[in-house]
């Protein structure tokens, strides 16, 4: 992987970073959030995106961002170092329980069955949040648009009693980075509420990263105060980007008091700093 300072000035030096207007936080009730956005999106290829992810950025479609909130540092970028990862007893049971699932890796593409499962998942898990009303176009913009090396993985249960029949259980979008896999979004059968499909998906990604000789699986943001994010703290060791540096994180002891926007101004790839 080429270090950004060794890259030609263009296109890395052409990236600009902007702060959005405040908007309601989707993770913590009553909070106001802002994001720092990397632009222009067409210059963000897989190599540059790898460096941005290491600096705490994520993507939604072709929109690349990281939290830039005033007075709050609740969102901690986290990743699992796959060679050091040791599954706990519950995770081992989950892996064994779903080992018969058939995973198929494909390019990003639209499938009516995937969209139907997505809508069922949103209606059951995030009712009233807005995404439960996503149109097909919104679904495609959110999950199927990418300018980097991305894949769609579907997981199916095969029915041995029915020749060739299968049941779609889960769909996951992942990005392949220079130093790991980045979990973009996952949705699964909401009728199997205790199946731990999400946990199995991360375990599967860890195994894939190992097979590809990639050192990390990036899990996005962990928020201590958000119950929906609690599962990420169950993967040990877990590294977090705190004060601009990756370090092993102990979620029970993490000292993450609210601060001003200085954290969001942590060094950017290529020596950029600040926001326009």
UniProtKB/Swiss-Prot annotation:
Cellular localisation: Cytoplasm
GO annotation, cellular component aspect: cytoplasm
GO BP annotations, alphabetical order: ubiquitin-dependent protein catabolic process via the N-end rule pathway
Name of the protein: Aspartate/glutamate leucyltransferase
Major localization class: cytoplasm
Family: Belongs to the R-transferase family. Bpt subfamily.
Organism phylogeny: Bacteria, Pseudomonadati, Pseudomonadota, Betaproteobacteria, Burkholderiales
Key words of the record: Acyltransferase, Cytoplasm, Transferase
GO molecular function: arginyl-tRNA--protein transferase activity; leucyl-tRNA--protein transferase activity
EC number(s) per entry: 2.3.2.29
Pfam families membership: ATE_C (PF04377), ATE_N (PF04376)
Signal sequence bounds: none
Keyword Lipoprotein: no
Record field: catalytic activity: N-terminal L-glutamyl-[protein] + L-leucyl-tRNA(Leu) = N-terminal L-leucyl-L-glutamyl-[protein] + tRNA(Leu) + H(+); N-terminal L-aspartyl-[protein] + L-leucyl-tRNA(Leu) = N-terminal L-leucyl-L-aspartyl-[protein] + tRNA(Leu) + H(+)
Annotated SUPFAM superfamilies: Acyl-CoA N-acyltransferases (Nat)
HAMAP family, per the entry: Bpt
Organism: Burkholderia pseudomallei (strain K96243)
Function: Functions in the N-end rule pathway of protein degradation where it conjugates Leu from its aminoacyl-tRNA to the N-termini of proteins containing an N-terminal aspartate or glutamate.
Claim: Acyltransferase is one of the keywords in the record: yes
């Amino acid at each position: 992987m080429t270090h950004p300072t060794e890259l030609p000035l263009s296109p890395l030096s052409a990236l600009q970073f902007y702060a959005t207007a405040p908007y309601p936080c989707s993770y913590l009730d009553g909070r106001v959030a802002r994001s720092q956005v990397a632009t222009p999106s067409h210059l963000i290829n897989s190599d540059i995106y790898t460096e941005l992810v290491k600096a705490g950025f994520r993507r939604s479609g072709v929109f690349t961002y990281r939290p830039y909130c005033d007075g709050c540092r609740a969102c901690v970028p986290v990743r699992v170092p796959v060679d050091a990862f040791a599954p706990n007893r519950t995770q081992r049971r989950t892996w064994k329980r779903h080992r018969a699932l058939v995973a198929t890796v494909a390019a990003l593409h639209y499938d009516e069955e995937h969209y139907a499962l997505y809508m069922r998942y949103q209606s059951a898990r995030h009712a009233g949040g807005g995404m439960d009303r996503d149109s097909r176009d919104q679904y495609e913009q959110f999950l199927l648009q990418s300018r980097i090396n991305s894949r769609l993985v579907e997981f199916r249960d095969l029915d041995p009693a029915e020749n060739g029949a299968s049941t779609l259980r889960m769909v996951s979008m992942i990005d392949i980075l220079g130093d790991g896999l980045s979990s973009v979004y996952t949705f699964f059968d909401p009728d199997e509420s205790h199946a731990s499909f999400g946990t199995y998906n991360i375990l599967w990604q860890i195994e894939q990263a190992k097979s590809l000789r990639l050192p990390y699986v990036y899990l996005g943001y962990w928020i201590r105060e958000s119950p929906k994010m609690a599962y990420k703290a169950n993967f040990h060791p877990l590294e977090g980007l705190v004060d601009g540096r990756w370090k092993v994180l102990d979620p029970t002891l993490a000292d993450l008091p609210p601060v001003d926007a200085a954290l969001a101004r942590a060094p950017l790839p290529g020596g950029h700093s600040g926001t326009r």
